[in-house]
From Swiss-Prot:
It comes from Polynucleobacter necessarius subsp. necessarius (strain STIR1). This is Enolase. SUPFAM superfamilies: Enolase C-terminal domain-like, Enolase N-terminal domain-like. Catalyzes the reversible conversion of 2-phosphoglycerate (2-PG) into phosphoenolpyruvate (PEP). It is essential for the degradation of carbohydrates via glycolysis. It catalyses: (2R)-2-phosphoglycerate = phosphoenolpyruvate + H2O.
Length: 428
């Protein structure tokens, strides 16, 4: 039995210099698993609770010593001696121990750190790479990356209201060529921005954060970068947006402050539809406020057959909310963020539910990241098909891309790359 003999939680820093939780799980054999959890900036109101200390004398109140203490005392007492290979049982133990619907007592940052560290230890004990431990022999599909090359909204201090402008190298034959494509576009964009006298500083997720006058102007510049890098937009590369619309929704209107617009739900759907008509946009995330289900129904009716409509704040990786969305025909894709729900077992359940309903699943990082690359292994192990893990800069983002390169190398000839075919529920 892969018995857990020790568990250690600690406070470490994420990519924004804020505290987060790391956990080590030691097995009877001497094998250790280590994991660190991410943290978001734009968060859904129904996400599992990230436990912070609130002590303003430490890290401006953002310390996580309470969550760490919960690992080292209460969680340790409950899982020491358990079999690390029984992931579902261990995760259920954590859920029951917490006793709330949103991990508010122990903290999702505590439960997730333990859940991930247990999986890493069990994979090491079994002599398996993590992606193989997650997916068995069936995990062989590399994901199409959504590469965030321009940051706006809550991820950057600029005039862009839309939070992320991304490129998706769908025309590549394999993941390594897709990564090269994204990197070449990123560097071409840097050259173009510099020539226009715009800053080339980067935001939280590694994308540039220039002050474009409009979303349209930003997309035009990205199109130039794609062409300048030697690729054809619409064939080799498609575009994706993360509106994070909950961040600029107020009093029933969508306030695009950068463009001086105040739009109703229907008008904002049309605004996004017009952008999709002018540019090769294949995916729009959080195009409506998380509670604007009428707006979501409208945008799904208008765009859902040709555009991937991803629910992030809408679904928060929660099967109960996703089930309701599926029943009402809201969106056609879910963003998967492991810290939104707080255990691996619940994460995998959300991915499986989405697939059964013909929704796509996009595995995602958070804006506050660490060097932990577990989401890369999840993307391959579950054959998710897409991953969103930032730009082509900042080592906290590159760590995931590099892990995917290693996995592709490990898989060898059996590795597949879906490209456009991952948008199996669209008619384009």
């Amino acid at each position: 039995m892969s018995a857990i003999v020790d568990i250690i939680g600690r406070e470490v820093l994420d990519s924004r210099g804020n505290p987060t939780v790391e956990c080590d799980v030691l097995l009877e054999s001497g094998v250790m698993g280590r994991a660190a959890v991410p943290s978001g900036a734009s968060t859904g109101s129904r996400e599992a609770i990230e436990l912070r200390d609130g002590d303003k004398s430490r890290y401006l109140g953002k310390g996580v010593l309470k969550a760490v203490q919960n690992i080292n005392i209460e969680i340790a007492e409950s899982i020491l001696g358990l079999d690390a290979s029984e992931q579902a049982f261990l995760d259920r133990t954590l859920i029951d121990l917490d006793g709330t619907h949103n991990k508010a007592r122990l903290g999702a940052n505590a439960t997730l750190a333990v859940s991930m560290a247990v999986a890493r230890a069990a994979a090491e004990e079994a002599g398996l790479p993590l992606y193989r431990y997650f997916g068995g022999s069936g995990g062989m599909q590399l994901p199409v990356p959504m590469m965030n090359i321009v940051n706006g909204g809550a991820h950057a201090n600029n005039s862009l209201d839309i939070q992320e402008f991304m490129v998706m190298p769908v025309g590549a034959e394999n993941f390594r060529d897709a990564l090269r494509c994204g990197a070449e576009i990123f560097h071409e964009l840097k050259k173009i921005l510099g020539a226009q006298g715009m800053p080339t500083t980067v935001g939280d997720e590694g994308g540039f954060a220039p002050n474009f006058k409009s979303n349209h102007g930003c997309l035009q510049t990205i199109m130039k970068a794609i062409e300048g890098a030697g690729y054809q937009a619409g064939e080799d590369v498609l575009l994706a947006l993360d509106c994070a619309a909950s961040e600029f929704y107020k009093d029933g209107k969508y306030h695009l402050a950068g463009e001086g617009l105040q739009l109703s739900s229907s008008e904002f759907s049309d605004y996004l539809g017009n952008l999709a008509d002018q540019f090769p946009i294949v995916s729009i995330e959080d195009g409506m406020h998380e509670s604007d289900w009428d707006g979501w129904a409208d945008i799904t009716k208008k765009l859902g057959k040709k555009i991937q409509l991803v629910g992030d704040d809408l679904f928060v990786t929660n099967t109960r909310i996703l089930k309701e969305g599926i029943e009402k025909g809201i969106a056609n894709s879910i963003l998967i963020k492991i810290n939104q729900i707080g255990t691996l077992t619940e994460t995998f359940a959300a991915i499986e539910m989405a697939k059964r309903a013909n929704y796509t699943a996009v595995i995602s990082h958070r804006s506050g990241e660490t060097e932990d690359s577990t989401i890369a292994d999840i993307a391959v192990g579950t054959n998710a098909g897409q991953i969103k893990t930032g730009s082509l800069s900042r080592s906290d983002r590159i760590a995931k891309y590099n892990q995917l390169l290693r996995i592709e190398e490990d898989l060898g000839d059996v590795a597949t790359y879906p490209g456009k075919s991952d948008f199996y529920n669209l008619k384009r």
